[in-house]
Amino acid sequence: MRGLGTCLATLAGLLLTAAGETFSGGCLFDEPYSTCGYSQSEGDDFNWEQVNTLTKPTSDPWMPSGSFMLVNASGRPEGQRAHLLLPQLKENDTHCIDFHYFVSSKSNSPPGLLNVYVKVNNGPLGNPIWNISGDPTRTWNRAELAISTFWPNFYQVIFEVITSGHQGYLAIDEVKVLGHPCTRTPHFLRIQNVEVNAGQFATFQCSAIGRTVAGDRLWLQGIDVRDAPLKEIKVTSSRRFIASFNVVNTTKRDAGKYRCMIRTEGGVGISNYAELVVKEPPVPIAPPQLASVGATYLWIQLNANSINGDGPIVAREVEYCTASGSWNDRQPVDSTSYKIGHLDPDTEYEISVLLTRPGEGGTGSPGPALRTRTKCADPMRGPRKLEVVEVKSRQITIRWEPFGYNVTRCHSYNLTVHYCYQVGGQEQVREEVSWDTENSHPQHTITNLSPYTNVSVKLILMNPEGRKESQELIVQTDEDLPGAVPTESIQGSTFEEKIFLQWREPTQTYGVITLYEITYKAVSSFDPEIDLSNQSGRVSKLGNETHFLFFGLYPGTTYSFTIRASTAKGFGPPATNQFTTKISAPSMPAYELETPLNQTDNTVTVMLKPAHSRGAPVSVYQIVVEEERPRRTKKTTEILKCYPVPIHFQNASLLNSQYYFAAEFPADSLQAAQPFTIGDNKTYNGYWNTPLLPYKSYRIYFQAASRANGETKIDCVQVATKGAATPKPVPEPEKQTDHTVKIAGVIAGILLFVIIFLGVVLVMKKRKLAKKRKETMSSTRQEMTVMVNSMDKSYAEQGTNCDEAFSFMDTHNLNGRSVSSPSSFTMKTNTLSTSVPNSYYPDETHTMASDTSSLVQSHTYKKREPADVPYQTGQLHPAIRVADLLQHITQMKCAEGYGFKEEYESFFEGQSAPWDSAKKDENRMKNRYGNIIAYDHSRVRLQTIEGDTNSDYINGNYIDGYHRPNHYIATQGPMQETIYDFWRMVWHENTASIIMVTNLVEVGRVKCCKYWPDDTEIYKDIKVTLIETELLAEYVIRTFAVEKRGVHEIREIRQFHFTGWPDHGVPYHATGLLGFVRQVKSKSPPSAGPLVVHCSAGAGRTGCFIVIDIMLDMAEREGVVDIYNCVRELRSRRVNMVQTEEQYVFIHDAILEACLCGDTSVPASQVRSLYYDMNKLDPQTNSSQIKEEFRTLNMVTPTLRVEDCSIALLPRNHEKNRCMDILPPDRCLPFLITIDGESSNYINAALMDSYKQPSAFIVTQHPLPNTVKDFWRLVLDYHCTSVVMLNDVDPAQLCPQYWPENGVHRHGPIQVEFVSADLEEDIISRIFRIYNAARPQDGYRMVQQFQFLGWPMYRDTPVSKRSFLKLIRQVDKWQEEYNGGEGRTVVHCLNGGGRSGTFCAISIVCEMLRHQRTVDVFHAVKTLRNNKPNMVDLLDQYKFCYEVALEYLNSG
C-alpha cells in the first residue's frame, strides 16, 4: 500500500510540476537532499539520514519504505537535536507547503518530538509553529503549512527532531511548495503593526481565508515575548473569518514581533510578523515654574520641554489641588504658560503638568509637583457688630461678630484695635493687636485709658494685601477720682491780712468736678510773738468755682493751702502750696504835740517810745528832720507822710531835699522810753545829727521800720517842731546849682525824644510799604493769571485743531504734574489743519504769539539781522497735529515704510545753492568731505586774519531755530588743521554750548579730531581750560573756560557730547537722545549766541539733533509738527541735512516718544507733594495720575520681536532659558569670553546702563543647575564686583545655591573661594575670591554678594523701603571702595524681570538725586525697558521707586 501511495504521490507531483503549480523548495528525496537546497545544521548533536529503501532495502519492520529523510532515535539519549533546513523562500503569491511525516516506535513510546519552525528574515527561531509528539502511528501522515509572510520578506522552514531516549524512527518525505492555497488550513492575510501606550490592551486583528472548525487552535505567537490567547473569532463569510487577540496590560517588555497562528487537523497557518510598539506616556522631568502669583490665580510656566517617556505631545493639562485637600482639578492647556484662576487666597496648592501622546492611555502620570501658595487677598469686609461689653474708668471691653477665612481671605492676618481719644487737648491714637480671633465670642479689653473720656474705637482687619475697617464706635469711659489740681495753678494774691486764692481744675478731671475742698493752716510767721494755733480751717467750694478770699489773717505769716478736687467717685490727691501775707508797718505810740523836753537854738530834745510790731519785729528806728519851707503845703506833707528813702544831711542840698536823716539806731536799743537830742552834732549809724539852724523852722519825725521777706514797712509820727529864731536869710554856698548841667540835661532829653519818635514813624512806614508791595505783587500775579487764562479761552473759542493737540498732550504728556517751571507753560497759536506759521521766528508784525511767548518763557536771545523766511508749508506736506502723530507714523510705516521712503526720496539731493568759497583751492583742505561743504549764502564768516580774505572760511552754516533766526551753526567735526578756526568761530559767535553727536573714532575711522584739552591748551591766541567733566551713561558734559588774548573776559562754554549713537544706523530708541536734548535746553544760556552742532560731516546726525530740537518747541507751542518742511528748510541752508531715510524715520519716532512721554523729571523739593497728588483718585475716571503714567509707560515700551532675540532662541540655548518668553535681545547680550570646553558663549543676561555709567548693570535670571558655571564665567569676564540676589534659594523652582558656604567651588576653569559672610538686618553679604585657574597671570577678583531677605516671594514689593535703600547704599559703597565705581553689578531675581528692574531703577533714581537733585522714575524705567520690556513690570513696583526716593530725601 505504501508503495502504491508513493507511486500515486510521485505521479501527482509530476502532474503538478508539469502544470507549473509547484515552486522551488520542495523535495521528494529521490536525489540527494542537497540538490533540493536542503542542509543540516553544523551544531546539531547528530544528522538526519537520507534513506531510499528502493535502492537499499531494509528488513526493519518499524522503518518506512521509499526515499525520505530519517532520524533513527534508537540508542540516542534524551534531548539530542537534529535540524533539517529548507532553502530560504521568498514567495508573495498564495502558496502552501505540503509534507509527509512518519513516526514509529519499538516500545509504543514516542521516539522523540518533531517540530517545524518558520524563521523570517534570518530573525530569531522563535517557537515551533507545528509539532507531533503523540503515539507512533507507523503510517505516513500529511500536514500543511499555510505560510503568509509576504514579499519582500523571506522565510526558511526548519524541521527539528528532539530525541526522547526511546527507540524508534521519525521521517519526513515529499515536501512540496504548492502554488495554490492549502486545502485544509486557512491562510492569513497581512496583519498590521500595532502601537499602543503602556498599560493598554494591544489588539491584533488577524483576517484569514479558509474555514475554522471547533478544535482548531488559534493564538498569537511572539518572538521572545509572551503569547497571547484568542479573544474572539468573527466569521465574515463561509470562507473568511477574523480572529482577535489581546496583549493585555502592555509594558515596554511586551514590545516586539507577533504573528497569528492557527493549528488545524490538517496543519498550521502562520501570518507575517507584525510589530507591537509600546510607547511610554510622557511625564515632565521638572515641576512647572511659577511666573507670577495673585490672590486668586497662579501663573505658571509648564516647563515641560524635558520629559521621560515618548512623544509627540498632543495635549497638555495642568492638574492642581490644595496641599491639604482631597479634591483636584484638571484643565487643558494650549500654550507654554497657563493662568490657574478661581483659586482661594493664601492657600497652598500643588500643581503638576500632565502630558498626552496620541492613542488611548497616552496621558502620562503627573509630573513633579510645584508647591506654592497664592497671595492673600484684600479682606472681604471689616468686622461687624462691634459693641461694648463692659465700661470702667480706665478700660473698656468690646466684642464683635466672629469671622473666618471667608472674610480674612488670608491665614496670616492681624486684627488691630484702633482707638483714639483726647488727652490734654492732644489727640492720642493707639493701636493694639487682638489675639482673640479664633474664639466663638471674640472680645478685647482696651486698658490704660483716661477716665471719663470719649474713646473712638474701630477694628481694622489687615492682611499683607489690604485692610478693611469696621464701623466706628464711640464710648465714654466711666468717671474716676480726679487728678491733683496743678500745683503751679494755685496762685495767691497776698495782702497784710488777706489772701485771694485761685486755682485751675485738675488737668485730668476724670469726670465732672463737683466740689473743691481747701484746707489752710498757718505754718510760720516773721513775728515770733504771734500765736498761730488758731490759724487753720477748711473751706468747700462748688466745682465751678476756682477762687476764694481768705481774710482775717495775720500779717507776715505763711499759710499752707491744700486743695482737693472731687468727682462723683470721690476726692483726688491733694495739691499744696504756701503763701505769706505781707507784713504791716509797726504801730507807733501816740504823741501829743507837747513841748519838747528841752530846746535850744541848735537842738531839740524829745522822748522816744518803742513801737509795737505787726507781722514782723521792728528792725530800726530813725529820726527825720524836715525843714519847713514857705511853699510847702499841707497836701505835700500828707503825701510824704513817712520817709522811705534815707538822705544824709550832706546830700540834702545837692538833691534839693527838704529832709534828712539825723539818726538811726537798732530796735533793741530802744526797749523803753528814753530822751534823744536832735542836733547834738553826733553820728548815729552813719547819719550826722547836725546842729539845727536857728533861723529855720523844722518838723521832727520819729519813724520805725520793719523788714522781712524782702519788703520794708515804715510808720512814723511827728514828735516835735522847732520854730525859727531869726528869720533873716543867710547865704548857703553848698546849695548853689550848676544851671549849665540842668540846661544840658533838658536839651538831651528833648533830642532823645525826637530820635525815638522818628524811629517809630520809620518802622510804621516800612511796614505799611511792605504790606502795599505784597498786595501789589498779589494783584500782579492775579492779573498775569487772568491774562493767560483769557488768552487760552480766546484761542479755544476759535475752535482750531490746536485744542485737540493739547488735549492729546494733556493726556500723554506727563508735564501736567504742576511742576512750576517756565517751560511748563504752553502757548497755543491760531493755526489751520493745513498750514503752520510762515516761519520759525516772527517778523516785525508778528506780535501776539511771540510777545506772549517771551513773557511766559522769559527768554532773551541774542539779536541778529533777520534772515530769509525759512519756508512756507507746502500743500502736499501740511503740518501734522500732535494728536494725529501716532496714526500718521503708523500709516507711513505700512507697506515696509513706503510712505517714509516716498517722502524722503522727494527731498532734493546734493548741491542746491552756490558754494564757491568752499571750493576755492585755499579752502579745500578745510573740508573733511568734498561733498559736504558750506553754501555761500548761509555760511559762517570768520574775521579775517592779517588781510587773508580766505581766512574767513569755515565749513559751517547758520540754521534758523523755531522763531529764532540763526539759532544753530551746523558744522563738520574739526580736523587737526581747523581746530583753531573752530575755537575762533565759537568765540566770535559768543557760543555757550557745543553739541557733539559723534565719537572720535568709529569702526576704525577717525570721525572727528579731539579739539579740546584734558587740562589746558593754547590754540594761538585762544586759551581753553577744562574745568569740569560730568560723565553720564549716554553723554558727557564738559565745561571749559575760554580766554582770548587781548580781551579781558573769561567765558564758560559747555560741550555736550552724545556718546550713545551707534557706529551704524540710528539709536535703537530715542530716550537717551531726548534726555540729551533736554539737558542742552536747560543748561544753554538764553542770551548766548548760536548752538554749535557737529557730528563728523555736520549733516546727518547734526540734522537729526536740530530737527528734533525745533520740532519739540513747535509741538509745545502750536500742537503741531512739520518735520518734512523742517528738513527741507535745513537742506536749503546746508547740503544733505538728515542724510538717510533711517534718520528721517528716527526723527519721527523720537518726536512721538517725546509727545507721549513728555519731560517727567521733578525737582527734589517737589517730589513729596507731586507724589501725593499723583496718587489722588480722580472720581470721574476712577484712576490716578500715577496709574496713567504707568499705563503710558507700558504703551511706549517696545515689544521684542523674534529676530531681536535670535541668539537666545537658538536650539542649543533653549535649556539655558528659565522662561522662553523672558529673553535678552541680541543687542545687549554679554557674550561669555572664558573658554570652557564645548560650552556656548550664551547666557540669559542683559547689559543695562546706570545713570552715569554705560552697561553698569547686568540683569540675569537666577542660575539654573546647568548654568551655574556660565554665571561665574559672566561675573569674571565682565569684571563684576557685586552680585545682588533678590529671590530665595528654592530647588523646587530650579533655583540652586550657586555659591560655596566654605572652601572652594570649581566651575570648569573658574574657582570661587569663600572668604567671609555677614548678616545685617535683611541683608546677607558674602565675599568671594574668584579667579581663572587656566590664566593665573590674570590674578583674582574680590566679589561681594548681597542677598536681600526683605522681599518674600509672595510680595510684589519689599517689606521695608528703608531696608531696600540700605541695600542700594551698601552696594554703592562696596563698588566705590573696591573698584572705584568701575566694576559692574550683577542683579538677579527668579527670571531677571520685575525685581531686578526695580533695583536698577531705584539705583538710577538715587544717582539722579545725588548728582542732579531731580527725580525721573519714568525715564529711569523707560531706559531699562528699552533693553528688557519686563523691567519694573508691576504698578506697585513703580510706586515703590517713588517711595524709596522719598525715603532717600528723608534720610538726607
Curated annotation (Swiss-Prot):
Which top-rank group of organisms is this from? Eukaryota
Q: Which residues carry this modification: Phosphoserine?
A: 821
Where in this chain does the record put each Tyrosine-protein phosphatase domain?
A: 900-1154, 1186-1448
**Would you kindly state one Gene Ontology biological process term found in this protein's UniProt entry?**
signal transduction
Q: Where does substrate bind?
A: 1063, 1095-1101, 1139
* Subcellular localization: Cell membrane
Q: What Pfam families does the entry give?
A: fn3, Fn3_PTPRU, ig, MAM, Y_phosphatase
Which residue positions carry a glycan here? 72, 92, 131, 249, 406, 414, 454, 534, 544, 598, 651, 681
Q: What is its main location?
A: membrane
A GO-annotated cellular component: perinuclear region of cytoplasm
Cytoplasmic face residues:
765-1452
What membrane topology does the UniProt entry give?
Single-pass type I membrane protein
Identify the catalytic residues.
1095, 1389
Q: Which CDD domains match?
A: FN3, MAM, R-PTPc-M-1, R-PTPc-M-2
Answer yes or no on keyword RNA-binding. Answer: no
Catalytic activity, EC = 3.1.3.48
Give the family per the record: Belongs to the protein-tyrosine phosphatase family. Receptor class 2B subfamily.
Name under which the protein is recorded: Receptor-type tyrosine-protein phosphatase mu
